Amino acid sequence: MPSTSMIEDRSEIERRRFEYLDHPADIQLHSWGSTMEEAFEACLVSMFGYMTDLAKVDEMYEFYWKASGDSLDGLLFQFLDEALNSFHAEPCFVAKRVEILRFDKKKFEIEFRGWGESFDTSKHETEADIKSPTYSNMQINEKPERCDIYVIVDI
């Protein structure tokens, strides 16, 4: 399983905008960006990156999703869960890159797309299986200069 300790170059962590934090039973994703949109994007990429090595994922096609929630936390949960469902069901899609197309913070709606390919066991190794995002200790910390997101995922 990937871990922060495996990556010695802190500049690489800053470039990709996410890291994995140890948790007693699961794993905590920590992502950030200069905007909430960037932090959401990085969080989703980190989720896929925890499941497989994204360096081996090619941007073969695009996948589109929509999600909605009843709060920002609910929206983040649905955002991650919607994409995770595409991994667990056909076409077993893995996103290497994500872009938010529409982000409505008042209606808690989001439209986004990812570039990647279908998971192929002959090409991709399974690092870990994420079953679901959780609300446990979920945090969205938005400041004028940066947004940080913390999400514990069930593995």
UniProtKB/Swiss-Prot annotation:
Keyword presence, Metal-binding: yes
Superkingdom of origin organism: Eukaryota
Residues annotated as binding Ca(2+): D26, D154, I155
Name of this protein: Protein archease-like
GO BP terms, alphabetized: tRNA splicing, via endonucleolytic cleavage and ligation
Organism of provenance: Caenorhabditis elegans
Family affiliation: Belongs to the archease family.
InterPro entries in UniProt: Archease, Archease_dom, Archease_dom_sf
Keywords: Calcium, Metal-binding, tRNA processing
Gene name for this UniProt entry: arch-1
GO cellular component, one term: tRNA-splicing ligase complex
One term of GO molecular function: metal ion binding
Keyword field contains Calcium: yes
Function summary: Component of the tRNA-splicing ligase complex required to facilitate the enzymatic turnover of catalytic subunit RtcB (F16A11.2).
